């Protein structure tokens, strides 16, 4: 997969989550352009949400959490979002960054380094967390039907 393909897939995920949020929070919106802090914002609650879409979890059994891009902290280490919405092919998980960090710490997980993908420029450090373990730390999970 290329960086651009992944970006497009991620934007579809953001719109999917935004549609769900609109039922309860009609003023929620997708942040325009690149905004490091979060992808979606709920003015009614003054809360930002980071959305992660993963099309490989059903094959690998892992969710992927970024901690560094190049040599700089990123992802879970720098997030300002109150919530993360993590989308797999079959599930939507609602989890706080603190619970992700707790999962990593409780289970002595170590980030692994991966080379850049096509269209990207820097290596990444990623935590690979078994989906079954990740689900235990999520505040809520919703079954979705094979979103691709």
What are these regions (language model features)?
Residues 1-36, 55-56:
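Acidic-basic catalytic patches of nuclease active cores, encompassing PD-(D/E)XK
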Residues 36, 45, 80:
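Residues that flank catalytic or metal-binding motifs in active/ligand-binding sites
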Residues 29-31, 38-40, 73-75:
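Short, flexible, glycine/charge-rich loop motifs used to bind or transfer phosphoryl groups or to couple energy/partner
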Residues 61, 90-148:
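Non-catalytic C-terminal interaction segments of nucleic acid-processing enzymes
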Residues 16, 41, 52, 68, ...:
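Intrinsically disordered, low-complexity regions of eukaryotic proteins
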Residues 40-57:
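Conserved catalytic cores of phosphodiester-cleaving nucleases, focusing on short active-site segments
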Residues 17-22, 40-44, 84:
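Alpha-helix C-terminal capping segments
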Residues 4, 27, 53-98:
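Catalytic cores of nucleic-acid endonucleases
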